[in-house]
From Swiss-Prot:
Function description: Secreted effector that completely suppresses the host cell death induced by cell death-inducing proteins.
Family: Belongs to the RxLR effector family.
Name of this chain's protein: Secreted RxLR effector protein 50
Secreted is among the record's keywords: yes
Signal peptide per UniProt: 1-19
Species of provenance: Plasmopara viticola (Downy mildew of grapevine)
Gene: RXLR50
GO cellular component, one term: host cell nucleus
Placement of sequence motif RxLR-dEER: 38-54
Compartments where located: Secreted; Host nucleus; Host cytoplasm
Keyword list, A-Z: Host cytoplasm, Host nucleus, Secreted, Signal, Virulence
Record's comment describing the protein's domains: The RxLR-dEER motif acts to carry the protein into the host cell cytoplasm through binding to cell surface phosphatidylinositol-3-phosphate.
Length: 159
């Protein structure tokens, strides 16, 4: 081997050893960089207690948070309104089902007229909410209603 090659290899080896020892000895920790960060992370977690844990909070700009709050309130009020309407419909069904589906249907017709509820919509509500109304019963109710209110025969065929 030539002397220049030997010097070249020897210089490269010295530089490599110097770089490795500098990296391992920095900060008095004799570990690799990944192991060092792992050690620092675990060491930091040992010193924190449960009530000192840091929670990162992302705060929205006030305009966005106000918009979201208003939207939530609108949705909540719509849900309350729908629930109130549903309760009102169920009360109507419970009120008129015994009248219309028994022999007291003419009293039911009178009450429907007083409250301004059309008979076809009441029949649809009764059917929708689980009351057993056959098509014959529906036709009988409609015909009885039309004859009670003296609606002309031409309108009896139309629903």
């Amino acid at each position: 081997m030539r002397s220049s090659t030997v010097l070249y290899v020897l210089g490269a080896a010295i530089l490599a050893v110097n770089g490795v020892t500098t990296a391992l000895i920095s900060d008095g920790v004799d570990k690799g960089s990944q192991e060092q960060t792992r050690w620092l992370r675990s060491n930091a977690m040992e010193h924190e207690t449960d009530d000192e844990e840091r929670v990162l909070e992302f705060k929205l700009p006030s305009s966005i948070s106000t918009w979201r709050a208003e939207r939530f309130e609108r949705l909540e009020s719509l849900e309350k309104q729908k629930e109130m309407e549903r309760q009102a419909v169920l009360e109507l069904v419970d009120k008129y089902a015994p009248l219309l589906l028994t022999d007291r249907m003419f009293a039911g017709f009178t009450k429907l007229d007083q409250e301004g509820i059309p008979l076809p919509s009441m029949i649809a509500l009764l059917r929708e909410h689980g009351k057993d109304i056959t098509s014959e019963m529906e036709a009988y109710l409609i015909n009885s209603y039309k004859t009670t209110h003296k609606i002309p025969l031409e309108l009896n065929t139309a629903r």
